[in-house]
Amino acid sequence: MSEFITVARPYAKAAFDFAVEHQSVERWQDMLAFAAEVTKNEQMAELLSGALAPETLAESFIAVCGEQLDENGQNLIRVMAENGRLKALPDVLEQFIHLRAVSEATAEVDVISAAALSEQQLAKISAAMEKRLSRKVKLNCKIDKSVMAGVIIRAGDMVIDGSVRGRLERLADVLQS
């Protein structure tokens, strides 16, 4: 877990509440995603770690973001820069997405497999996870050859490891004990 998660939570909540009130949740998520990516840029990371005045840092950051930020998004950047919190933007995005998922009664579910899954397989996984979590799910499918076969399903703190790799690891643990 990131060191900025506690710092990010109030900014994410404020941004989310504002976005809901102004019916612009999708736009805000896009703005936060772009701003979070900007913080990952090597040159911007140096600026964020430097000794620039908050006003200068905020204006530089806003200039880099260009038209990707509306006036309200720019105001959030200014407040975060003033408080020395721009490095927390990736965590603000993460918390914003979490608040949106809770609000929309959806859950992000990562499905990791060795090969692409068929629509039928994805539908079965989706139905099973919706039943288990009692909410709608959004599947994020990833391919990882190291899984070998089977799938790994992650939803929040829950992990269901039905992969061959996981079974081999568990077997190795049993044999070593």
UniProtKB/Swiss-Prot annotation:
The keyword Ion transport applies. One of its GO terms (cellular component) is plasma membrane. It comes from Escherichia coli O6:H1 (strain CFT073 / ATCC 700928 / UPEC). NCBIfam families: ATP_synt_delta, PRK05758.2-2, PRK05758.2-5. It comes from the Bacteria. It is a peripheral membrane protein. This is ATP synthase subunit delta. F(1)F(0) ATP synthase produces ATP from ADP in the presence of a proton or sodium gradient. F-type ATPases consist of two structural domains, F(1) containing the extramembraneous catalytic core and F(0) containing the membrane proton channel, linked together by a central stalk and a peripheral stalk. During catalysis, ATP synthesis in the catalytic domain of F(1) is coupled via a rotary mechanism of the central stalk subunits to proton translocation. The keyword Manganese does not apply. Keywords: ATP synthesis, Cell inner membrane, Cell membrane, CF(1), Hydrogen ion transport, Ion transport, Membrane, Transport. Coiled coil: none annotated. One of its GO terms (molecular function) is proton-transporting ATP synthase activity, rotational mechanism. Gene3D superfamilies: N-terminal domain of the delta subunit of the F1F0-ATP synthase. It is found in: Cell inner membrane. Belongs to the ATPase delta chain family. InterPro entries: ATP_synth_OSCP/delta_N_sf, ATPase_OSCP/d_CS, ATPase_OSCP/dsu. F-type ATPases have 2 components, F(1) - the catalytic core - and F(0) - the membrane proton channel. F(1) has five subunits: alpha(3), beta(3), gamma(1), delta(1), epsilon(1). F(0) has three main subunits: a(1), b(2) and c(10-14). The alpha and beta chains form an alternating ring which encloses part of the gamma chain. F(1) is attached to F(0) by a central stalk formed by the gamma and epsilon chains, while a peripheral stalk is formed by the delta and b chains. Pfam families: OSCP.
